[in-house]
Amino acid sequence: MESSTTRQGHGEPARTPRGTGPRVRDPLALLTAEFDGVHDVWRSAAGTVCVAGPEPARAVLGNRDGAVAETADFYRTRHGDFGPRAAQIRIGRAGRALIRRHLDARRPELPALVAEHLVPSSVWPDAGNLLVFRHLRDVLLHRGASPQLHATIGQIVHRAVLAGARRRHSPPSRLLFRRRALSVLHAEIRARQREFGSFHEPRDLLDVVVRESEPGSDPKDLAEVYLSFLFAAVGSVGFALGWTVHLLGTHPDRLAMEPSWTVREALRLWPVAWLFARTPSHVQRLGGTEVGPRDRLAVCTYLVHRHPGHWERPDEFVPERWAAPVPDGAYLPFGHGPHTCAGATVTMRLLEDLVGIITRDRWLSVTHDGAGPQVGPALAPPRFTAVLSDRTGCPGRR
């Protein structure tokens, strides 16, 4: 797992820079302050081994030679990784196919959806999450499901998926809601397990999870896998849309650029999945730093995407950089290796469609208070208001 990079200083053990400012609690700000732009791997002041270089990041996430304990981020449950691996693959493949069919069928509805939810103004990042939820709600849960189940899924989105939503409720309230919501989900999963085989095609993603898992799987584990779909589809995709809208609104000279460029550049600057935790399987050297099973590795794709040795103008919004080949090895918005996000392709397509519709025939302006990202397991945009207005006589993007 030794980094193969030969830039000056990379072969030396990393040193944690000593700062004189106040103690930083924000983990993103802490990692950014510690990264010196030279050492790709270092041991942070908190003891975590941080990875910011593309090569060691790919080595860790790709798990070359079994260097780290096998971990599936999407399928991680309270009881460990959901499995077996064959079931993960089946669920991912079937879920991706179902979402793709849904997007193909509902693509013509997107312009009206944008007009209804975002025009003339909208408050983000919630607007992005709720727009995606509205567009995907039938694939998340089929229309024939019980009103109680539909209400529960909607409450989960509002109380747990939206940025900062959990902070708006007290710990006892969150615990009580979690118990009630999981009770409803567990009951539905048990019912679908009993009726397994009575339907030929999956009606929604919950069917996919039940059908493609191993017989006798614990409903509690299946509920967590289903919630991973919900959080990824509504949370991650919504936040990625929010970052793209925020950047375009604050860089109006970039509005006419190709949606594929702006989406990719937004995910470079602000990768929603920004931090991946891993545990070394044995003592080894990673980028000049000795690590072992007692260490916690933190692969920070935010820093990989802004690495000054691999990107020109790394901290600037430059969508046009995607008009030419880019250093793919330093671009990991969906992770890397065997557990790369299975829905990356369909996610990018939906984002590009939405950004194209938002910007094609409208002016976009954004007002915000200058706050930074909302940092958590996902990297969410700050709160801002987006205003869309028609371009009089605009011929549209060609």
List each language-model region with its residue ranges.
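Conserved cytochrome P450 K-helix/beta-meander segment immediately N-terminal to the heme-binding cysteine loop
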Residues: 65, 300-325
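Central I-helix of cytochrome P450 enzymes
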Residues: 136, 205-266, 351
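Cytochrome P450 heme-binding "Cys pocket" and the immediately downstream C-terminal segment
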Residues: 346-379
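Cytochrome P450 catalytic-domain helical core, especially the substrate-recognition surface
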Residues: 4-27, 47, 54-191, 392-398
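Conserved cytochrome P450 K-helix E-x-x-R motif and the immediately C-terminal K′/meander segment
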Residues: 17-35, 256-289
